[in-house]
Amino acid sequence: MATGDLKRSLRNLEQVLRSLNYPREVDCVGLVKGDTAASLPIISYSLTSYSPYVAELLVDSNIELLAKNDLRFIDTVYKLLRDQFNYKPILTKKQFIQCGFAEWKIQIICDILNCVMKKHKELSSLEKTPSQQRKKTSSAKSEPCSSTEKTSTEPVGIDVTGRFVTSGKKKAVVIRHLYNEDGANIPEDTVTDVNEAFDVCDIKAAEITIPELQVPDINCEQEDITVNPEVTALQSMLAECQEKLKKLTCIESRLESLEEKMKGKVLVNEKTWANLLSRVTLLETEMLLSKKNDEYMQFNEMSEDYSSSSDMDSLNPDRKSKEERHANIPLSSGYSTVSSDSTPRTSTVNYCGLKEISEETTMQKMERMKKMFEETAELLKCPNH
């Protein structure tokens, strides 16, 4: 994009803003960069604050431009330009919001300002026509009254013959009447006619003063129109406040329902809950391991008892020989006693079987303990725990 085109478009914008009487400072750097923040204040001023007629048109068409973000503002402006001004911008909404397209954006701003000034002239001319008609009617009423006033203000004289004579080019109506020789007495009929003419003039003069009294009313209406944009802004703010209050009531009702649902419940953080679960699992494993250790200790004690008893039997051979002798001697009753060798043999056999069973159970217990230790190690390795 050439710099000359940008300078030309900026000059055009300055001229339009001068004709618009724009009171604020213009961000020329932002306009050259194509920043939307530099162009939006100009558009909002032209549509809301420049012309009371345009502001009234916005109110009649239920268009709100105040208290909106950039996207909604541009959306409403594009709709307003399409519906009320019959203007379609060159750029789309997305392109206008994006940074860039500086020359096109300046051209669109100039077009919008020209459209607003044109609409202002149209609406002001429409309001001027009824006021001009009122002035014409008032002037038409004042003309006959002024003519009657001129006729009445002219000096009237009474001729010797009893005629009313006015000084001037215009001749007054001559009223003939009879009079006595004693004095020229004017009859009552002529006096009443003249009084009626003056009364008519007074009525017309009063009618002329009525439109003069209506002029300050028109000025008051214009002042009301200038105040209307501020009133519309306040109305829009009130509407937004009402919407926010409705949302607050909805949020309060939801909070109350949540409080009723969450009565009697305890909220725990995920990390703390995971830590608690890991601790519980560790405690369970400790309990199991302690039980296994107790069982293993009891089993060792039992095996030690069995081994000590077997050693004691081996240390007493004399006792065994005596028992064998007693077994070889037949009893007098005829019954044969069971040999004493059977008891230690059976005890040794039972001891061997118990030893094998105990070894198997210990191996199984050790494997289970290994599995438990591995599971606890995996649980402790997890980062959440």
Swiss-Prot record:
Interacts with CROCC. Interacts with POC1B; the interaction is direct and recruits POC1B to centriolar microtubules. Binds to centriolar microtubules. Residues 126-154, 303-348 are annotated as: Disordered. It is found in: Cytoplasm, Cytoskeleton, Microtubule organizing center, Centrosome; Cytoplasm, Cytoskeleton, Microtubule organizing center, Centrosome, Centriole; Cytoplasm, Cytoskeleton, Spindle pole; Midbody. Residues 305-314, 332-342 have a biased composition (Low complexity). This is Centrosomal protein of 44 kDa. Centriole-enriched microtubule-binding protein involved in centriole biogenesis. In collaboration with CEP295 and POC1B, is required for the centriole-to-centrosome conversion by ensuring the formation of bona fide centriole wall. Functions as a linker component that maintains centrosome cohesion. Associates with CROCC and regulates its stability and localization to the centrosome. One of its GO terms (cellular component) is centrosome. GO terms for molecular function: microtubule binding. The modification Phosphoserine is found at residue 342. The modification Phosphothreonine is found at residue 343. One of its GO terms (biological process) is centriole replication. It comes from the Eukaryota. Residues 11-192 are annotated as: Binds with microtubules and centrioles. Keywords: Coiled coil, Cytoplasm, Cytoskeleton, Phosphoprotein. It holds the Pfam family CEP44. It comes from Bos taurus (Bovine). Residues 230-271, 358-381 form a coiled coil. Residues 316-327 have a biased composition (Basic and acidic residues). Signal peptide: none annotated. Residues 139-154 have a biased composition (Polar residues).
